[in-house]
Amino acid sequence: MNFNVGDKIVYPMHGAGIVEAIEERSVCNEKQAYYIIKMPGEVKVMVPTAKAESIGVRNIIDQETALKVIDTLEQDRTEMSVKWNKRYRDNVEKMKSGDIYEVADIVRNLTFKQKDKGLSTTEKKMLLNAKQILVSELVLAGNKEKEEVEQLVDNKINTSYELHSVANVVDSTDVSTANVIKKFIPQT
């Protein structure tokens, strides 16, 4: 897949950016073409054009897909290993995949875990990195400001956490609004 200057792309493990230039550079006496990608925070990344596809560089999602990704943040957490090192390896693989749904899953699950029990320093860093990757793509896909997207992501996850935490406390399979209210509000 070839990209052009101005294309909005995603570089797995780094996030979304814009192809600012395509330049030929000499590395180890070998000339090679590189995409110069402007990432959030004024960071620039060079990716060899010949290897871009094999390392997972792709076009950003469209607005319709962005809305679906945001909707996934409202779902309940998915199964994670109780062993932190296995959970960490699983999450690294998800992030390497470049799949935005997997990244959203990591952000939601680790945020839920942080609210429940807290996170290790390593998982806190992973959460921050995954959230930056998620937000960077949603910003470019929706032509929105970073702060607006961060607030939206936080609100969706917080609402989901409250909903699913309450639902998990209710001993019944009926988690209708009426049943949840009966459980937590004393009846007079």
What is the meaning of each model-derived region?
Residues 1-57:
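A positional/architectural concept
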